[in-house]
């Protein structure tokens, strides 16, 4: 939020009046290890792209970005996907039970996110998409 506040100030605006959008990569599951494996398989190649790799580094994960870059260059899939510790995945992704993912989106809102875009992790079957969106239906979720 620090960057948003600085940018708003430079533009002569109050950061609290700006819509702050976050695309949340969500996977609803009771098996967090399976969810983390899904995250690794989809986001290691994504963050191997130089543009997104630099973004990951800018976001405060320089060691992860370097490991992905080096693993990708070596064509070592295990090294590339293994660059993400569980802790990093839990910071970047939103993985867990219905209650856990709802709580995380509420935490983000309390931190200043005004609009959360709920996105399934990767290309998913329709039933998994419904499972992802279900906890955020209007009759099941409020801030």
What are these regions (language model features)?
Residues 1-143:
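Active-site-adjacent structural elements that line small-molecule/cofactor binding pockets in enzymes
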């Amino acid at each position: 939020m620090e960057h948003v506040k600085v940018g708003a100030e430079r533009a002569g605006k109050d950061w609290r009046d700006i819509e702050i959008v976050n695309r949340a990569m969500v996977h609803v599951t009771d098996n967090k290890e399976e969810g983390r494996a899904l995250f690794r398989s989809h986001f290691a190649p994504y963050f191997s792209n130089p543009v997104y790799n630099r973004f990951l580094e800018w976001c405060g994960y320089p060691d992860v970005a370097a490991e992905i870059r080096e693993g990708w260059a070596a064509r070592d899939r295990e090294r590339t996907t293994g660059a993400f510790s569980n802790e990093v995945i839990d910071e970047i992704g939103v993985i867990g039970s219905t209650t856990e993912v709802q709580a995380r989106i509420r935490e983000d809102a309390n931190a200043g996110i005004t609009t959360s875009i709920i996105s399934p992790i990767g290309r998913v079957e329709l039933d998994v998409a419904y499972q992802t969106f279900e906890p955020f239906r209007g009759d099941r979720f409020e801030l």
